[in-house]
Protein backbone atom coordinates (compact mmCIF):
# COMPACT_ATOMS: atom_id res chain seq x y z
CA UNK A 1 0.00 0.00 0.00
CA UNK A 2 1.33 3.44 -0.93
CA UNK A 3 2.02 5.53 2.16
CA UNK A 4 1.96 9.28 2.69
CA UNK A 5 4.53 11.43 4.45
CA UNK A 6 3.52 13.76 7.29
CA UNK A 7 6.72 15.85 7.19
CA UNK A 8 9.39 16.69 4.62
CA UNK A 9 12.21 15.11 6.62
CA UNK A 10 12.27 11.52 5.30
CA UNK A 11 12.12 12.53 1.64
CA UNK A 12 14.68 15.32 2.16
CA UNK A 13 17.09 12.84 3.71
CA UNK A 14 16.48 10.40 0.84
CA UNK A 15 17.15 13.21 -1.65
CA UNK A 16 20.57 13.73 -0.06
CA UNK A 17 21.32 9.99 -0.43
CA UNK A 18 20.18 10.09 -4.06
CA UNK A 19 22.29 13.14 -4.94
CA UNK A 20 25.37 11.55 -3.35
CA UNK A 21 24.79 8.26 -5.19
CA UNK A 22 24.21 10.12 -8.47
CA UNK A 23 27.53 11.95 -8.04
CA UNK A 24 29.43 8.88 -6.87
CA UNK A 25 28.25 6.93 -9.93
CA UNK A 26 28.68 9.97 -12.22
CA UNK A 27 25.14 9.61 -13.59
CA UNK A 28 22.99 12.26 -15.23
CA UNK A 29 19.30 12.51 -14.45
CA UNK A 30 18.65 11.33 -18.03
CA UNK A 31 20.67 8.16 -17.35
CA UNK A 32 18.80 7.53 -14.10
CA UNK A 33 15.42 8.02 -15.82
CA UNK A 34 16.24 5.63 -18.68
CA UNK A 35 14.10 2.52 -18.36
CA UNK A 36 11.45 4.05 -16.09
CA UNK A 37 9.04 4.89 -18.90
CA UNK A 38 8.55 8.34 -17.35
CA UNK A 39 9.76 11.81 -18.30
CA UNK A 40 13.07 13.22 -17.15
CA UNK A 41 11.32 16.17 -15.48
CA UNK A 42 8.87 14.00 -13.52
CA UNK A 43 11.47 11.52 -12.27
CA UNK A 44 13.90 14.30 -11.40
CA UNK A 45 11.16 16.02 -9.39
CA UNK A 46 10.45 12.70 -7.65
CA UNK A 47 14.14 12.20 -6.85
CA UNK A 48 14.17 15.70 -5.36
CA UNK A 49 11.23 14.77 -3.13
CA UNK A 50 8.30 16.32 -5.02
CA UNK A 51 6.44 13.25 -6.39
CA UNK A 52 6.00 9.57 -5.60
CA UNK A 53 7.34 7.15 -8.20
CA UNK A 54 5.35 4.13 -9.37
CA UNK A 55 6.78 0.88 -8.01
CA UNK A 56 8.36 -0.23 -11.30
CA UNK A 57 10.11 3.14 -11.81
CA UNK A 58 11.26 3.24 -8.17
CA UNK A 59 12.86 -0.19 -8.60
CA UNK A 60 14.68 0.89 -11.79
CA UNK A 61 16.00 4.01 -10.06
CA UNK A 62 16.84 2.04 -6.92
CA UNK A 63 18.92 -0.46 -8.89
CA UNK A 64 20.87 2.30 -10.63
CA UNK A 65 21.57 4.16 -7.38
CA UNK A 66 22.03 1.09 -5.13
CA UNK A 67 19.13 2.11 -2.89
CA UNK A 68 17.93 -0.40 -0.30
CA UNK A 69 14.36 -1.76 -0.16
CA UNK A 70 13.24 0.82 2.42
CA UNK A 71 14.59 3.67 0.28
CA UNK A 72 12.86 2.28 -2.82
CA UNK A 73 9.60 2.09 -0.83
CA UNK A 74 10.11 5.66 0.40
CA UNK A 75 10.46 6.84 -3.22
CA UNK A 76 6.91 5.55 -3.72
CA UNK A 77 5.45 7.50 -0.79
CA UNK A 78 3.42 10.67 -1.29
CA UNK A 79 5.63 13.55 -0.15
CA UNK A 80 4.89 16.86 1.47
CA UNK A 81 5.34 18.93 -1.69
CA UNK A 82 6.77 22.37 -2.25
CA UNK A 83 10.20 23.89 -1.84
CA UNK A 84 9.48 27.45 -0.67
CA UNK A 85 9.01 26.67 3.01
CA UNK A 86 11.62 29.24 3.99
CA UNK A 87 10.06 32.17 2.11
CA UNK A 88 11.71 33.75 -0.92
CA UNK A 89 14.18 31.27 -2.45
CA UNK A 90 17.85 32.17 -2.12
CA UNK A 91 19.22 29.79 -4.77
CA UNK A 92 19.91 31.99 -7.84
CA UNK A 93 18.38 29.61 -10.39
CA UNK A 94 15.22 28.98 -8.38
CA UNK A 95 15.01 32.68 -7.56
CA UNK A 96 14.94 33.56 -11.29
CA UNK A 97 11.84 31.39 -11.73
CA UNK A 98 10.33 33.06 -8.67
CA UNK A 99 11.23 36.43 -10.23
CA UNK A 100 9.69 35.40 -13.57
CA UNK A 101 6.41 34.61 -11.84
CA UNK A 102 6.62 37.83 -9.84
CA UNK A 103 7.04 39.86 -13.05
CA UNK A 104 4.92 37.82 -15.47
CA UNK A 105 2.46 36.07 -13.12
CA UNK A 106 -0.26 38.69 -13.49
CA UNK A 107 0.29 38.72 -17.27
CA UNK A 108 -0.04 34.94 -17.47
CA UNK A 109 -3.18 35.07 -15.31
CA UNK A 110 -4.75 37.78 -17.48
CA UNK A 111 -3.96 35.96 -20.72
CA UNK A 112 -5.16 32.58 -19.40
CA UNK A 113 -8.43 34.15 -18.27
CA UNK A 114 -8.87 36.04 -21.55
CA UNK A 115 -8.22 32.95 -23.67
CA UNK A 116 -9.88 30.29 -21.47
CA UNK A 117 -12.16 32.04 -18.98
CA UNK A 118 -12.05 31.93 -15.18
CA UNK A 119 -10.00 28.94 -14.04
CA UNK A 120 -6.52 27.59 -13.47
CA UNK A 121 -3.79 25.67 -15.22
CA UNK A 122 -3.29 22.36 -13.44
CA UNK A 123 0.08 21.42 -11.96
CA UNK A 124 -1.30 17.91 -11.37
CA UNK A 125 -2.35 17.07 -14.95
CA UNK A 126 0.89 18.64 -16.14
CA UNK A 127 3.96 18.12 -18.29
CA UNK A 128 7.27 19.96 -18.05
CA UNK A 129 10.06 19.98 -20.60
CA UNK A 130 13.34 21.85 -20.88
CA UNK A 131 15.53 22.10 -23.95
CA UNK A 132 18.90 23.71 -24.56
CA UNK A 133 18.99 25.55 -27.90
CA UNK A 134 21.60 27.65 -29.66
CA UNK A 135 21.16 31.41 -29.37
CA UNK A 136 21.75 33.09 -32.77
CA UNK A 137 23.53 35.88 -30.87
CA UNK A 138 25.89 33.37 -29.26
CA UNK A 139 25.61 31.10 -26.27
CA UNK A 140 22.53 29.09 -25.42
CA UNK A 141 18.91 29.63 -24.50
CA UNK A 142 16.62 27.57 -22.28
CA UNK A 143 13.24 26.69 -23.77
CA UNK A 144 10.93 25.67 -20.94
CA UNK A 145 7.49 24.30 -21.72
CA UNK A 146 4.82 24.22 -19.01
CA UNK A 147 1.92 22.13 -20.33
CA UNK A 148 -0.99 22.01 -17.88
CA UNK A 149 -4.63 21.12 -18.31
CA UNK A 150 -7.01 24.07 -18.04
CA UNK A 151 -9.57 23.60 -15.28
CA UNK A 152 -12.48 26.06 -15.33
CA UNK A 153 -13.88 27.45 -12.11
CA UNK A 154 -17.31 25.91 -11.55
CA UNK A 155 -19.94 27.96 -9.76
CA UNK A 156 -21.77 26.06 -7.03
From Swiss-Prot:
Q: Name one GO biological process term.
A: cyanate metabolic process
Q: Which InterPro entries match?
A: Cyanase, Cyanate_lyase_C, Cyanate_lyase_C_sf, CYNS_N, Lambda_DNA-bd_dom_sf
- What keywords are assigned to this protein? Lyase
A single GO molecular-function term is: DNA binding
Q: Any idea of its EC number?
A: 4.2.1.104
Q: Does the keyword Membrane apply?
A: no
The keyword DNA-binding is assigned to this record: no
Highest taxon, organism lineage? Bacteria
**SUPFAM superfamilies, per the entry:** Cyanase C-terminal domain (SSF55234), lambda repressor-like DNA-binding domains (SSF47413)
Q: Which residues form the active site?
A: 96, 99, 122
The chemistry this enzyme catalyses reads: cyanate + hydrogencarbonate + 3 H(+) = NH4(+) + 2 CO2
Q: What does this protein do?
A: Catalyzes the reaction of cyanate with bicarbonate to produce ammonia and carbon dioxide.
Family the UniProt entry places it in: Belongs to the cyanase family.
Quote the NCBIfam families the UniProt record gives. Answer: cynS, PRK02866.1
Q: What is the protein name for this chain?
A: Cyanate hydratase
Amino acid sequence: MIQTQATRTARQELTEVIILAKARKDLSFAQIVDGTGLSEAFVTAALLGQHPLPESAAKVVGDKLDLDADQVALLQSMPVRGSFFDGVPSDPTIYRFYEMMSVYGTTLKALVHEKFGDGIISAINFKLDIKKVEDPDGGHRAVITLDGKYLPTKPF
